[in-house]
Regions:
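Membrane-associated alpha-helical segments
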Residues: 241-361, 367-368
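Short secondary-structure boundary segments
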Residues: 34-58, 224-241, 357-367
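Short Lys/Arg-enriched alpha/beta "domain-start" segment
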Residues: 1-206
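Short, surface-exposed, polar/charged, turn-prone segments marking secondary-structure boundaries
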Residues: 47-49, 122-126, 237-238, 244-248, ...
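Extended, charged amphipathic alpha-helical segments
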Residues: 170-269
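Short, flexible coil/linker segments at or flanking structured domains
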Residues: 73, 81-83, 198, 203-205, ...
Length: 371
């Protein structure tokens, strides 16, 4: 079993953020949502929070809202009654729960393990998303809550005691690997090295360790880093969704391409399939561009490096490459279907011309007048 050397360490101040990302539709009219939220004065409803960090340029700026609710117990920890809601124009929503950290450091492993695919939080977060969709339904284009959810944990440690000679991120890698992986069973050296390999620091007193299940942040005022990680998690969800949609589009495109044509096709039947495939291709390309171009990091190379590390850990480049490849394949299918439809139309025109010529020749053999 896992034996912690964190026993002598105590967290003085910290927060665990449990983030759940959902997709609720094709797009969201943020201005309309903003007006609706501003006009809603009912207690316990959504309210605005601070704007995006200064180094961020969102296009357009997502809505960051707060919502009151009851606390949830996870082991010995209680969530804050205030839940953070982020709404993106490309159809994504995140629900973030906060757990105060102010006790033995070794409790982080238990909390990380308990939060991994935590059913009560998954159920509660989906319920909040369903309520949100009901509230802003008219502001959502093609509203539909996807089955997929992308959850992520961020442990932000501002201070701990007693002071250590070496920073924890260099002297306690084994223990931190257990926190990052949410695993109490002993880990192999290779697993420990992999879990803690994506590490970045700006100064001597801060560090960020980024893994696929969670991240551990050391230092004060790490909200910018947290915001980058939250967006990367949303981007991962959207890439997964888009990749799955393109798989379906490719299957439907291949089926339409290989479908045996009718002997006498109805007018416009080929155009219908071609238009449908073109719409799937355009939808995929637009969503890809909107997601990948939403966040711009202005004048802060450190945050840009944090994003690159998160992208590396989440394999976003591999998802991007897969999506671009499938978009190209879908375009190829569209071109083939379009060419086939054009050929079909030309063949029909040729037969019409042949029939007209035959009729004109046949008519010439029959006198049209009387005696």
């Amino acid at each position: 079993m896992y034996a912690s050397s964190f026993t002598s360490l105590t967290i003085n101040k910290g927060t665990c953020y449990a983030v759940f990302a959902y997709d609720i539709g094709w797009s969201i009219n943020l201005e309309e949502v903003n007006r609706r939220i501003t006009a809603d004065k009912e207690p316990g409803r959504l309210r605005h929070k601070t704007r995006a960090p200064q180094y961020f340029e969102y296009r357009p700026v997502p809505l960051r809202l707060m919502q009151e609710g009851g606390s949830l117990a996870v082991g010995q920890y209680q969530s804050s009654p205030t839940v953070e809601v982020m709404v993106y124009d490309f159809g994504a929503v995140t629900i973030t729960y906060r757990f105060a950290l102010d006790g033995p450091f070794e409790g982080l492993v238990e909390l990380s393990e308990s939060l991994y695919e935590n059913e009560p939080l998954l159920t509660e977060s989906r319920m909040r998303v369903e309520q949100l969709v009901q509230t802003i339904h008219s502001s959502i284009e093609r509203p539909k809550i996807a089955k997929e959810v992308e959850d992520y944990l961020i442990f932000s440690i501002e201070s701990y005691s007693p002071p250590q000679v070496l920073p924890l991120w260099t002297s306690r890698e084994t223990e931190l690997a257990h926190v990052l992986r949410g695993e109490r069973t002993p880990l192999a050296d290779q697993e420990i090295q992999d879990a803690t390999s994506c590490r970045i620091s700006y100064g001597l007193e801060d560090a960020a360790l980024i893994d696929w299940h969670s991240a551990v942040l050391f230092g004060k005022e790490m909200d910018d880093v947290r915001a980058v990680l939250e967006f990367a998690n949303v981007e991962l969800l959207e890439m997964r969704m888009l990749d799955e949609q393109l798989d379906t589009a490719l299957d439907e495109g291949y089926e339409a391409l290989t479908r045996k044509p009718r002997l006498l096709p109805l007018p416009g039947s080929h155009d219908k399939d071609t238009t449908y495939i073109a719409q799937l291709q355009v939808d995929g390309a637009l969503l890809f561009e909107r997601v990948t171009n939403t966040l711009k990091l202005l004048g802060d190379q450190y945050l840009a490096r944090v994003y690159r590390l998160a992208s590396q850990r989440f394999h976003l480049e591999a998802w991007d490459a897969s999506i671009l490849r499938k978009l190209e394949t879908l375009e190829s299918i569209y071109d083939k279907m379009s060419n086939r439809a054009t050929t079909r139309r030309m063949e029909v025109l040729e037969w019409i011309i042949i029939v007209l010529i035959a009729v004109s020749i046949a008519v010439s053999f029959f006198p049209m007048g009387g005696h």
